[in-house]
Amino acid sequence: MCSPGRAPPGPAPAGDLPPEWETDDERMAFLFSAFKQSREVNSTEWDSKMAFWVGLVLARGRRRGVVRTCLRELQNGFERRGSVPLGLGTVLRELLRRGKMQRESDFMASVDSSWISWGVGVFILKPLKWTLSSVLGDSKVPEEEEVLIYVELLQEKAEEVYRLYQNSVLSSHPVVALSELRSLCAGVCPDERTFYLLLLQLQKEKKVTILEQNGEKIVKFARGLHAKVSPMNDVDIGVYQLMQSEQLLSQKVESLSQEAEKCKDDARSACRAGKKQLALRCLKSKRRTERRIEELHSKLDAVQGILDRIYASQTDQMVFNAYQAGVGALKLSMKDVTVEKAENLVDQIQELCDTQDEVAQTLAGAGVNGLEMDSEELEKELDSLLQDSAKEPVHLHPVPQKDSGFAGAISDAELEAELEKLSVCDGDLAQKTPSASSEPQTALGLNL
């Protein structure tokens, strides 16, 4: 039985259907009828019906957010008043022809992946009972149970998984466990089958590569949005093993820390109950646990130091490669440039600038005599403006007289009186504060 996803396979909500779905019975009867054997009989009706169902099928997949579907699921989803569309098989065949949809088995076969062998059990693929003749024979419709994939939606969700990884803490390492990645993508992938399809799409785009190591599958991502992933090598496997060691050591340290805290609580309880020997044993156990924690911390620091050095060396290699590329580009760009050519070019530019200045001066001198103004007339006009300015009275606001002192001055006596009031208030507050109890607390002489 086809099970494309977890979304409910029931009829589409009314808001996702066209207006004529409930109002125009005559048109819906036409749309629910089967396609003619040949488009040439009436191409206009054929194209109108095909456009209607193609849009609905693609919109339904995007609304439900699942990348897989089948003919039976679509028939149930588009059921109307007990009737199912009779031409959906032809519509799916057309979508397959256009490349909007693809058979799940064909998609898997198109990916050159060595890990599909262990993924077959997850996909639960049935024997390929259908053949090309059964699909493209007289009926020209796919099998009802055959799973189809929305190609564009699969690509978009695969890109979403890649961005999700890049924005997570897992991206600090080039290699990640498949189980950790599955947990990270739980919100994007409704089921495990979809998750593996998205990984296949990413591998098809050369953004991930997957390897099985000691019974556990690990995933390596490309280090960049447009970069291609490199094959898994010994360094990647070594880094993954170090990461696993770091994780195990961290978990062990956390567990021992909780154990040490429990020993401390037990010692405190025994101390309050007057069981001194039991309290001492609990403290000894706490000390032993703390020594084990210190040993694990030293090992954890060593592992983290190695990882830091590996990441630093990878960064140094990237910088070195960038320097090499920059030097090569600079050499190529400076291939035909010499000092002599540069000096010759500068001389030519200087000569052209001098020539341009001479031409500009020549052109400017042609109209100087006609436009030159008499300097004496300009001086007379300036004197006239100065005389007019001297005759205008200047209105200034009166300057306020400054008093020898300000009205709000405070004398020293007033300040001393205010200070005395503050001192009295502080003394009253100090008398009202209760004194701390000085009674000694009795307990066993254990340092907890």
From Swiss-Prot:
Residues 1-12 have a biased composition (Pro residues). Residues 241-392 form a coiled coil. It is found in: Cytoplasm; Nucleus envelope. Its main location: cytoplasm. One of its GO terms (biological process) is protein transport. The keyword Coiled coil applies. Residues 1-20 are annotated as: Disordered. GO terms for cellular component: cytoplasmic side of plasma membrane; ESCRT III complex; multivesicular body; nuclear envelope. Keywords: Coiled coil, Cytoplasm, Nucleus, Protein transport, Transport. Belongs to the SNF7 family. ESCRT-III-like protein required to recruit the ESCRT-III complex to the nuclear envelope (NE) during late anaphase. Together with SPAST, the ESCRT-III complex promotes NE sealing and mitotic spindle disassembly during late anaphase. Recruited to the reforming NE during anaphase by LEMD2. Plays a role in the endosomal sorting pathway. This is Charged multivesicular body protein 7.
